[in-house]
Amino acid sequence: MQTLKYHRIMLKLGGESLSAAGGSGIDAVQAKDIARRIKEVRELGVDVAIVIGAGNLWRGRVGQEMGMDQATADYMGMLGTVMNALALMDALEHQGVMTRVMTSIEMKTVAEPYIWRRAIHHMEKGRVV
């Protein structure tokens, strides 16, 4: 049996990783492939936390070009990250991987509030956060 160098990892995924090559939006094939790879890591006994971007859905420079208030553009990006997290959550759970989506923006019906200790607890229970 191999010895793991890390027992807990944080994976940073750009939003574009959920898009088909050269595209935008969320591609089901890409989401399933990423979920399969994450499942393989979990099966090694590694705790996994994921931070996902939203570049496939929203780019801040578009907001700048529109003359949008920076805070509004930032909020749009944060909403995009939750959308991507929900898509990845669904792909993971279809493969039998328990997950929790957490966010610092309050939206109780779709994601838990991010609390560091709660995130650690979820990972200790075998969930991908």
PLM regions: where:
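N-terminal glycine-/serine-/threonine-rich phosphate-binding loop
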Residues: M1-D47
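Solvent-exposed alpha-helices and their adjacent loops that cap or buttress functional pockets
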Residues: M1-K5, E40-L44, A49-I50, H94, ...
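General beta-strand structural signal in soluble alpha/beta enzymes
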Residues: L11, A49-G53, T99-T103
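Short, active-site-adjacent cap segments at secondary-structure transitions
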Residues: S17-S19, G55-G60, K108-T109
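N-terminal active-site beta-alpha-beta segment that forms phosphate/nucleotide-binding
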Residues: K32, E40-V41, D47-V48, A54-R61, ...
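Extended interaction regions within the primary functional domain
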Residues: D33-I34, I50, M107, H122
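Ligand-binding beta-strand-loop-alpha-helix segment within the catalytic cores
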Residues: G63-V129
